Design a protein with these regions (language model features):
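Structural recognition of the beta-strand scaffold that forms the well-ordered cores
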Residues: 55-60, 82-87, 112-117, 152-157, ...
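Catalytic His-Asp segment of secreted/periplasmic serine-dependent ester chemistry enzymes
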Residues: 160-237
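Oxyanion-hole/transition-state-stabilizing segment in secreted/luminal serine hydrolases
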Residues: 65-79, 93-138, 143, 154, ...
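N-terminal secretory targeting modules
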Residues: 1-59, 63-72, 76-77, 146, ...
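Extracytoplasmic/secreted proteins, especially bacterial periplasmic and envelope-associated proteins
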Residues: 42, 58, 91, 95, ...
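Proline-centered flexible-loop/turn and helix-kink motifs
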Residues: 79, 149-150, 185
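Short, glycine/acidic-enriched loop or turn micro-motifs at the edges of active sites
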Residues: 64, 90, 196
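Acidic/histidine-rich helix-loop elements
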Residues: 27-31, 68, 85-93, 123-129, ...
Length: 237
């Protein structure tokens, strides 16, 4: 995600990164895939059929996308809020951004949007810097704030991945989370780091929670729900 897509406000928010490195040209325009187009069309029809009647928006990748099928019981907790799940497997920040800029936020007025995105930026490209992934997350937050000014955003830390705390990807995830935490304003953007909830006291990510070291199973989704439900209840008031 190139820095040229960030507004001065977002750049100021990420002031801790004095000069974001020039990124590879991973722009929304070059992020489109056949899968994206197909799922995007499905989402647009879903929005039209429901006449935009959704109170809760979920934005993310396969981790978000898989919740309804992998843990129906926990996902059912959102039913009273009429959720719209905009997760797509494998997506990076620039692909999510393309979708949000091309209609998926139009005609809806959710009370809360929960955003968890960025792990595929870090996992799919070994040279992807945390600053680049954070810039993509920042642009997504900015886009939601612009298109849905009355919607509160619950921005989550990128979930831990890989079993051991010493694994290299863990450090990059942590560095990215440290950056996106700066987007918290305590009013319309609430940042919540729930990393510890998934880990043992020693920092291990067990197969009992994420069998492949990335995607939650039913137990992992229960942990996710327990970690965010009180905050969501407050934001939904």
């Amino acid at each position: 995600m190139s820095c040229r897509f960030l507004s001065p406000i977002i750049l100021a928010t990420l002031a801790g990164v004095a000069a974001l490195p020039a990124a590879e040209p991973r722009t929304p325009e070059t992020a489109v895939t056949p899968v994206l187009i197909t799922r995007h069309s499905t989402f647009m029809k879903q929005i039209a059929d429901a006449k935009g009647d959704f109170d809760f928006l979920l934005v993310g990748d396969s981790i978000t996308d898989g919740w309804p099928s992998k843990s129906k019981e926990t996902y059912a907790a959102f039913a009273p809020w009429k959720p719209l799940n905009l997760g797509i497997s494998g997506e990076r920040t620039e692909q999510v951004l393309w979708r949000l800029l091309n209609g998926e936020l139009d005609g809806i007025h959710p009370k809360v949007a929960m955003v968890m995105i960025g792990t595929n930026n870090l996992g799919h490209a070994a040279d992807e810097k945390p600053e680049w992934a954070a810039a993509g997350v920042a642009k997504i937050v900015e886009t939601i704030r612009t298109k849905l000014p009355n919607t509160k955003i619950l921005l989550l830390s990128i979930f831990p991945r890989s079993e051991k705390p010493t694994d290299g990807i863990r450090a990059r995830v942590t560095a990215t989370n440290d950056l996106i935490a700066k987007l918290h304003d305590g009013k319309m953007v609430i940042y919540k780091d729930i990393t510890a909830a998934f880990l043992t006291p020693e920092g291990v990510l067990t197969k009992e929670v994420m069998p492949d070291g990335l995607h939650p199973n039913a137990k992992g989704y229960q942990i996710w729900l327990d970690a965010v439900k009180p905050t969501l209840d407050e934001l939904m008031k």
